[in-house]
């Protein structure tokens, strides 16, 4: 029996040791994650307070590693070091635990030396003598462990995000275009200072109209319309960071109303609020017969199946019912979605289920993530995706799948030919050094539009360019050329401008990462380090389309019938040169190089507050309509009223432009568009073929930017 008992005790000891090792390894893995590193703190505390010797010290090292790993990226060291946040967190954990294990090895090795044993015994005596009473010793342990806890809390917890859900402003959203006499739905939301819906809001609202003749902008005083009666909102008794999920029979800060406007023109619904004592404007509503509709969407976001937050069901609900989008694409990273069991199939199923023709359009999409040549969000107009997603991921052994965009084009060729589906590949965050776009891989069949603005910043010009007013995250070194959209246009690429949120926080169409609500305890949760380093508000894309179906929305994107805005605002913009508007090849052909070009821009500004909504201000409608020609500022035209039509005549010759050999980099016998490119080019081929291109950017004094174009002008043969 004694032998059996000894073997049993030995087995138990080994099993217990293995369980401890597995638990410690789980803690080390948790320490690398965003916010959920608190699990590592708990596991570290378990070892620190429940074990002795090396396990006790290991518990403290684990908790300290988790705290330091959080502080690294969240205090900006990822930007200082240039190390990607996830890799920086992993490096900090590895170094911290590695140093502790190295200390253990040294301790074991030196334990054979008498002088070292005497030294450590004396040191313990000095340290423990003041803490000899049990209670005092326990208090000292607690205080010691509070160091990593406090370090972790300092960057991971924001009490205001937890408790401050107080009403701050109202947001009024309506369709951009309706027919005279048609009843339509509009939404009134109350936001807190983090732009989340305030569950506490209980104000009374009343409705009125402010109307203007279209396109002249003269005020309309006799308007036939039916607006809702006064209404008192019912709020929850407690704050919520996701009020739209509450199911308590109350409004919880969000309600839909119905209205009808019979008089043609541009109209703003004004909502007077008893709680804040202010009036708020809706977006402009164009009431006109026989016009194309304007629909709003977000076509580049990420959720829980890759490196974002929120399930597909949550994403589609938020996009449709909270952000009030007309179309939306959840575009998970191809290499990450493959890691989850059946994730791709579930994503396709959820996307197709959320599609409601005439009400809400979902587009299947997937992101090709190649840090060497740039990212492409691939979207499709059908109900299927390629069986092998677009993947480039050497860090998980998938690098050979599609090593360059050339293989991506082959995959899209095969898929569209075999299914009849159409595809677009959308370049984005083109000027961010980590993901810089290499335009030399351009494919005109799939690359027709490019992301001009998102939570990563502005891509119209390189961040150091004098016409780059907003900048970007992680900009390249000063003087870097050839990564902006303007640079691509100067090379002769045919690209139009769209915007998206690139939401990683589970709020498509209205990303909250530019507010303090990026913290990990803001729902929906995530393990990924992808929502704290995006200080810019997410953008939206508007399309001119005949109807709300996948085919019609996709066709509008493919045919460049679109414009973009830098936040949740929804202005009306119409841009023509000699009567030619955006769409198709967006090209005006003139008789001669000296033919005058009459540029007209009709702008109806959105009266909503711009992001971030930290300070209330009544709209003063001050903005500048900028006309950019071939990458230079041709004209700046001020406006100071809600609806304005501005005109400018360009009498300069049609010359075209080029990227220029001087902007290329010569390396090992070949030219490249910049030092980041690995695909040789012929500098003499980087030109517009004699075409001039024009872009309109609206710069509002409140910080909102809107973009439309380009339109190209060429001399007819």
Predicted regions and their residues:
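A metal-dependent hydrolase metal-coordination microenvironment
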Residues: 264-266, 274-275, 279-280, 288-438, ...
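C-terminal functional module detector
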Residues: 35-36, 40, 75-93, 100-103, ...
């Amino acid at each position: 029996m004694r032998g059996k008992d000894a073997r049993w005790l030995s087995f138990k000891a080994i099993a217990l040791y293995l369980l401890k090792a597995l638990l410690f390894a789980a803690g080390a893995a948790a320490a690398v994650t965003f916010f959920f590193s608190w699990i590592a703190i708990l596991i570290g505390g378990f070892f620190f307070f429940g074990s002795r010797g090396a396990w006790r010290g290991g518990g403290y090292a684990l908790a300290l590693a988790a705290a330091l790993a959080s502080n690294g990226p969240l205090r900006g060291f990822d930007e200082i070091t240039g190390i990607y946040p996830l890799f920086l967190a992993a490096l900090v954990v590895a170094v911290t635990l590695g140093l502790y294990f190295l200390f253990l090895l040294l301790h074991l090795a030196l334990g054979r030396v008498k002088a070292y044993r005497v030294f450590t015994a004396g040191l313990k005596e000095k340290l423990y003598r003041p803490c000899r009473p049990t209670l005092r010793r326990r208090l000292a342990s607690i205080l010691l462990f509070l160091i990593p806890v406090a370090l972790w809390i300092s960057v991971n917890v924001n009490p205001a995000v937890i408790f401050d859900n107080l009403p701050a402003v109202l947001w009024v959203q309506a369709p951009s275009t309706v027919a005279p006499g048609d009843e339509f739905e509009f939404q009134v939301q109350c936001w807190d200072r983090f732009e989340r819906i305030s569950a506490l809001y209980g104000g009374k609202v009343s409705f009125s109209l402010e109307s203007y003749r279209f396109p002249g902008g003269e005020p309309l005083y006799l308007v036939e319309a039916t607006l809702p009666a006064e209404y008192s909102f019912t709020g929850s008794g407690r704050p919520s960071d996701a009020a739209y999920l509450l199911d308590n029979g109350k409004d919880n800060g969000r309600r839909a109303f119905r209205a009808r406007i019979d008089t043609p023109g541009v109209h703003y619904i004004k909502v007077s609020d008893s709680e804040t004592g202010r009036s708020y404007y809706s977006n402009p509503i164009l009431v006109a017969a026989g016009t194309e509709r304007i629909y709003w969407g977000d076509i580049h976001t990420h959720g829980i199946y890759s490196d974002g937050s929120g399930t597909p069901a949550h994403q589609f609900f938020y996009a449709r019912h909270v952000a009030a989008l007309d179309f939306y694409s959840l575009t998970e990273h191809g290499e990450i979605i493959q890691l989850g069991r059946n994730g791709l199939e579930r994503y396709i199923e959820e996307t197709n289920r959320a599609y409601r023709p005439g009400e809400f359009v979902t587009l299947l999409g997937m992101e090709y993530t190649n840090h060497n040549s740039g990212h492409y969000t691939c979207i499709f107009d059908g109900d299927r995706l390629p069986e092998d997603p677009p993947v480039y991921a050497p860090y998980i052994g998938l690098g050979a799948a599609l090593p360059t965009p050339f293989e991506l084009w082959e995959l899209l060729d095969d898929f569209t030919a075999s299914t009849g589906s159409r595809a677009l590949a959308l370049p984005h965050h083109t000027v961010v050094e980590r993901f810089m776009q290499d335009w030399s891989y351009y494919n005109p069949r799939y690359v027709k539009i490019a992301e001009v603005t998102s939570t990563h910043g502005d891509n119209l010009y390189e961040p150091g360019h004098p016409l780059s007013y907003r900048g970007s995250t992680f900009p390249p070194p000063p003087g870097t050329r050839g990564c902006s959209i303007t640079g691509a246009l100067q090379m002769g690429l045919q690209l139009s401008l769209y915007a998206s949120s690139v939401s990683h926080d589970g709020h498509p169409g209205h990303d909250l990462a530019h507010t303090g609500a990026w913290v990990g305890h803001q729902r929906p949760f995530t393990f990924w380090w992808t929502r704290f380093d995006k200080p810019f508000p997410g953008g939206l894309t508007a399309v001119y389309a005949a109807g709300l179906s996948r085919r019609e929305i996709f066709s509008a994107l493919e045919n460049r019938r679109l414009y973009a805005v830098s936040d949740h605002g929804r202005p009306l913009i119409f841009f023509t040169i000699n009567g030619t508007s955006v769409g198709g090849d967006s090209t005006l052909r003139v008789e001669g190089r000296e033919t005058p070009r009459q540029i007209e821009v009709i702008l109806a500004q959105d009266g909503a507050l711009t992001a971030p909504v930290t300070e209330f201000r009544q709209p003063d409608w001050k903005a500048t309509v900028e006309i950019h020609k071939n990458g230079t500022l041709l004209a700046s035209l001020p406006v100071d009223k809600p609806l304005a039509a501005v005109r400018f005549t360009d009498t300069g010759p049609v010359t075209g432009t080029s990227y220029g050999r001087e902007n290329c980099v010569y390396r090992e016998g070949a030219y490249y568009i910049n030092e980041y490119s690995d695909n040789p080019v012929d500098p003499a081929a980087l030109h517009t073929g004699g075409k001039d291109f024009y872009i309109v950017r609206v710069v509002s004094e409140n910080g909102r930017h809107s973009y439309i174009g380009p339109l190209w002008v060429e001399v007819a043969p």
